[in-house]
């Protein structure tokens, strides 16, 4: 049996750690196709914390891509499951035949699907990547991303799959006994990454609610982001009084982040692509509705699960937010497909498809 190899092709420590720990804790014991990994980035204790996995680390995208291509050429029966991708050399290898379509299975994380970067080298690369994506053996993604991908690549097989958000199912009912009243608290963005368009989001929140709400902006990740954090803080202070603006520059531990989310009444996400599903899941679990850009296709997944969705183009006020909270409280969160442990079934099927065990 040729064992499936999983590839984390870009050095994104928090996502890579989440995926590795999920495979170690939830999949490796029951599937031989859930144990072999090639990862761009440093070990940083991951091998020790994931003893059920065999993980090979590479110093960067280029060295990892070269190793993957060599393995693909040496054994055309070898299959690879690419998580997130983010690696131009791998896309070019798929396009040129270095990696065959039958060897290439891709879990879409969002960024490699949408063409949002304005830099010249990205704009030149996008058409090549689009051509390469036509050659993927099978894509795995959210319902919204599958729909988006199918518009340009209708012949590529697509299967529903959700990123393994770290969640405690016992907390699914935690919002039911909470009373919400008084000044609303709104979470803006899911990290300090510029893709959150924090300043535009703060302006949109101010346009809807004025300086009558408290705004919390978590910006502790990525590191070395002080200049942008200060830019967001100053823009926020032009809109909101100091007591109503909380820009968090330190990375929060998971429990502290959960506590922060539970203090919010609304999540506000202005970005036009699917991202931040982890934060969305934790907010929904806590009974906190979310405002999405209508261009963000994840709204399709939310409506499929009978969850209320608010849009950035809606006229919002406190009554509308409280009604969305009421609707969310009536949903049985144990049935939501993208919650833990429900997404496990999708992962087991994805492994079987990528390994060639099921058609």
Swiss-Prot record:
Pfam families: Glyco_transf_56 (PF07429). Its EC number is 2.4.1.325. It is found in: Cell inner membrane. Coiled coil: none annotated. The keyword Membrane applies. The keyword Lipid metabolism does not apply. It is a peripheral membrane protein. InterPro entries: WecF. Pathway: Bacterial outer membrane biogenesis; enterobacterial common antigen biosynthesis. It is an enzyme of class 2 (transferase). GO terms for molecular function: 4-acetamido-4,6-dideoxy-D-galactose transferase activity; fucosyltransferase activity. GO terms for cellular component: plasma membrane. Belongs to the glycosyltransferase 56 family. Catalyzes the synthesis of Und-PP-GlcNAc-ManNAcA-Fuc4NAc (Lipid III), the third lipid-linked intermediate involved in ECA synthesis. This is TDP-N-acetylfucosamine:lipid II N-acetylfucosaminyltransferase. It comes from Escherichia coli O1:K1 / APEC. The gene is wecF.
């Amino acid at each position: 049996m040729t064992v499936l190899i999983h590839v984390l092709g870009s050095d994104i420590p928090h996502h890579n750690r989440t995926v590795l720990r999920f495979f170690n804790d939830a999949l490796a014991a029951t599937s031989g196709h859930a144990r072999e990994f090639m990862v761009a980035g440093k070990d940083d204790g991951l091998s020790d914390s994931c003893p059920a996995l065999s993980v090979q680390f590479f110093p960067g995208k280029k060295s990892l891509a070269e190793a993957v291509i060599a393995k693909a050429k040496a054994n055309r029966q070898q299959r690879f499951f690419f998580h997130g991708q983010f690696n131009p050399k791998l896309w070019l290898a798929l396009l040129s035949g270095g990696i065959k379509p039958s060897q290439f299975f891709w879990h879409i994380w969002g960024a490699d699907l949408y063409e949002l970067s304005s830099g010249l080298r990205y704009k030149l690369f996008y058409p090549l990547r689009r051509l390469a994506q036509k050659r993927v053996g099978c894509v795995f993604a959210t319902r919204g991303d599958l729909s988006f991908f199918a518009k340009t690549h209708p012949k590529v097989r697509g299967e529903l799959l959700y990123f393994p958000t770290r969640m405690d199912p016992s907390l699914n009912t935690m919002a039911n006994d909470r009373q919400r009243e008084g000044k609303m608290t709104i979470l803006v963005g899911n990290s300090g990454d510029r893709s959150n368009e924090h300043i535009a989001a703060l302006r949109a929140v101010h346009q809807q609610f004025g300086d009558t709400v408290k705004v919390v902006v978590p910006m502790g990740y990525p590191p070395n982001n002080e200049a942008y954090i200060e830019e967001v803080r100053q823009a926020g202070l032009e809109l909101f009084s100091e007591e109503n603006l909380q820009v968090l520059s330190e990375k929060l531990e998971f429990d502290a982040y959960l506590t922060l989310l539970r203090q919010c009444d609304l999540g506000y996400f202005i970005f036009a692509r699917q991202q931040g599903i982890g934060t969305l899941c934790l907010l929904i679990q806590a009974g906190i509705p979310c405002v999405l850009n209508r261009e963000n296709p994840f709204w399709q997944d939310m409506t499929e699960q009978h969850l209320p969705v608010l849009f950035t183009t809606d006229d919002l006020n406190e009554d509308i937010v409280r009604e969305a909270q009421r609707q969310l409280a009536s949903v049985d969160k144990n049935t939501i497909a993208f919650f833990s442990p429900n997404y496990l079934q999708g992962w087991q099927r994805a492994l079987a498809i990528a390994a060639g065990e099921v058609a």
